[in-house]
């Protein structure tokens, strides 16, 4: 383990994460989604609560002193998702300090913390996570107001995404980066529409156009559903022909889900774990029936009430669930919201949204800053 006669101690201590509840920290907000002005007509077991999350041993604690430290104390372990140098809180502690260390004659102890956040299914062959970081441009080509995907001319937007992905690759050379287009395929509306569901479904032609942009470049496509006064059960099936393609994945936006019948945009909406589990089972069946690699399911969140029963979200290796913190504000406010809505309610993987409009994110966090979050996000979205 080192030079000379060293001493080693294997230590592991479980760190409990708070599963739910409020926080005195402020929470970031995000703008409401404006109406698109276009005429475009094997069940798994529920996930264990965070306090039951699996832990892995802390790495060997090495002492280079010739004196054996018989009073060494276990080092506290903080839970995290991956044993990876990419985690926001450094995997290598500078030193382990204990009030009794001066009695041992031992040199400063180097500690490597292995974080587990939480226990996720072992990735199946072809799974994107955790070995890939997805960099996505969000929006709708029919609106300049919904995000960067529709704000620029298509070729300009695609070139910009490619360059953005390159910057992320430089920020973390240990994780492969792949670009993605995140299309709002079902857009919540202030107007009720013909069926009074307060949502507008994009035509197959519009979805196909964006799909071809992604497929031609070997990128990913995410289809985002804002159900309005509809439901996930109503909206998901029509997208299955697209989701049957290996490069197409799913996203759900609770902000615009109005189970109480409110008009989207007048209040922050909500989805329950039951909605997420339905989507997950549907995708898992599609993966099995069509022989596909695992799907990614992104769920947006910037308040705790946007997603109820998070600890009841099932774990199925065929579907990798990402909780995407999509609030805006200063870096301090975004980190506080991250702590409350992601870090304290672990599901599987994590995502982080960045708003290019300086009125929303001020200043815009850099890739180097974002990769230091813990757990380090695997999904990054620009709006």
Language-model-detected regions and their locations in the chain:
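Sec-dependent bacterial lipoprotein signal peptides
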Residues: 1-18
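Substrate-binding surface in catalytic domains of secreted glycosidases
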Residues: 254-292
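Aromatic-lined carbohydrate-recognition surfaces of secreted/lumenal glycan-active proteins
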Residues: 227-232, 288-306
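Active-site beta-loop-alpha junctions enriched in small/polar residues
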Residues: 140-142, 184-188, 226-228, 255-257, ...
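Acidic, His- and aromatic-enriched active-site or binding-groove loops in soluble protein domains
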Residues: 204-207, 243-254, 273-277, 317-333
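Alpha/beta catalytic barrel-like cores
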Residues: 20-52, 56-200, 317-319, 333-383
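Alpha-helix N-cap and loop-to-helix initiation/capping positions
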Residues: 152-156, 198-202, 231-234, 267-278
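Substrate-binding cleft of extracellular glycoside hydrolase catalytic domains
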Residues: 167-171, 176-255
């Amino acid at each position: 383990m080192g030079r000379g006669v060293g001493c080693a101690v294997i230590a592991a201590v479980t760190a409990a994460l708070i599963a739910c509840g409020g926080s005195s920290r402020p929470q970031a907000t995000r703008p409401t989604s404006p109406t698109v002005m276009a005429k475009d007509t094997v069940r798994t077991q529920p996930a264990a609560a965070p306090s039951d999350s699996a832990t892995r041993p802390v790495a060997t604690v090495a002492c280079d002193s010739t004196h054996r430290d018989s009073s060494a104390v276990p080092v506290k372990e903080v839970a995290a998702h991956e044993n990876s140098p990419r985690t926001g809180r450094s995997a290598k502690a500078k030193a382990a300090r204990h009030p009794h260390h001066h009695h041992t004659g031992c040199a400063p102890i180097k500690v490597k913390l292995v974080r587990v956040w939480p226990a996720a299914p072992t990735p199946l062959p072809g799974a994107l996570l955790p070995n890939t970081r997805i960099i996505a441009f969000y929006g709708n080509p029919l609106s300049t107001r919904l995000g960067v995907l529709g704000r620029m001319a298509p070729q300009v937007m695609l070139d910009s995404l490619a360059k953005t992905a390159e910057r992320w690759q430089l920020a973390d050379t240990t994780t492969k980066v792949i670009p993605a287009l995140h299309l709002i395929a079902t857009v919540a509306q202030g107007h009720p529409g013909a069926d009074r569901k307060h949502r507008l479904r994009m035509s197959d032609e519009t979805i196909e156009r964006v799909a071809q942009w992604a497929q031609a470049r070997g990128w990913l496509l995410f289809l985002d559903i804002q159900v309005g006064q509809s439901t996930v059960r109503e909206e998901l099936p029509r997208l299955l022909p697209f989701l049957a393609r290996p490069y197409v994945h799913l996203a759900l936006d609770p902000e615009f889900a109005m189970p109480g019948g409110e008009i989207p945009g007048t209040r922050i909406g909500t989805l329950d774990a039951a909605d997420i589990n339905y989507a997950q089972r549907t995708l898992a069946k599609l993966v099995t029936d069509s022989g596909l690699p695992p799907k990614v399911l992104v769920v947006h969140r910037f308040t705790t009430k946007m997603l109820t029963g998070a600890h009841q979200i099932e774990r199925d290796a065929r579907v990798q669930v990402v909780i995407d913190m999509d609030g805006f504000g200063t870096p301090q406010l975004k980190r506080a919201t991250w702590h409350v809505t992601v870090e304290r309610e672990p599901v599987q993987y994590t995502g982080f949204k960045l708003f290019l409009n300086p009125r929303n994110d001020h200043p815009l966090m850099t890739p180097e800053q974002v990769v230091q979050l813990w757990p380090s996000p695997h999904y990054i979205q620009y709006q």
